[in-house]
A protein has these predicted regions:
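Solvent-exposed, polar/charged alpha-helical surfaces in well-ordered, non-transmembrane soluble domains
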Residues: 3-4, 101, 114, 127, ...
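A mature extracytoplasmic/lumenal domain signature
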Residues: 33-35, 41-45, 131-133, 157, ...
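Bilobed "Venus flytrap"/periplasmic-binding protein-like clamshell domains
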Residues: 107-138, 158-162
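Ligand-site clamp/hinge motif
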Residues: 132-168
């Protein structure tokens, strides 16, 4: 994410997220292992950890194995151009950003680390989420979270909610 997305001027025209800077300076970034990275600032960054834990968290990772098919540095140009045309995007960067939106749940093929995975198209009036079998948290008894296997959100006009509730 850091090298291929956050610091790519085509994908992030204003650069990395503001919360990654301390007094205007970006951190040093190191890959420690296949599973670990390190961000190191010259001075403390009091905003970084709260940003990771916020309701709309700072996503400092991406599923490279999936996203590389939409990135000009990794995908074959002919394949990438076909995808750009098929999805009616103006260029590869617009396609990459469309397929990479972790906040909208509009790409049901995007691998996520969240507790549930959206399995319905966002254009529908029902959003269906299934438990992510790869979610990384467990409870104190060792059972994988979340407990709920599936939930469905019905999207309706606020004038219809009373009627829908009344009819079950």
């Amino acid at each position: 994410w850091w090298e291929d997305v956050a610091n790519n001027p085509k994908l992030s025209p204003v650069g990395p997220p503001k919360v990654m800077k301390v007094e205007g300076k970006l951190p040093q970034f190191k890959i420690l292992s296949n599973l670990s990275v390190q961000y190191e600032w010259e001075k403390p960054n009091p905003d970084f950890l709260p940003a990771l834990a916020s309701a709309s968290p700072l996503y400092i990772y991406r599923p490279a194995h999936y996203m590389r098919q939409f990135h000009k540095d990794f995908a074959a140009n002919s394949k990438l151009q076909k995808l750009v045309t098929a999805t009616k995007q103006r260029n590869w960067a617009a396609l990459h950003n469309k397929m990479d939106n972790l906040y909208r749940n509009d790409n049901i093929d995007l691998p996520v680390l969240q507790p549930w995975v959206c399995v319905s198209k966002s254009s529908s009036n029902r959003l269906r989420f299934k438990r992510n079998a790869f979610f990384h948290r467990i409870d104190p008894q060792g059972q994988q979270l979340p407990y709920v296997d599936e939930f469905i959100f019905g999207i309706a006009n606020n004038k219809l909610i009373s009627a829908k509730t009344g009819t079950g």
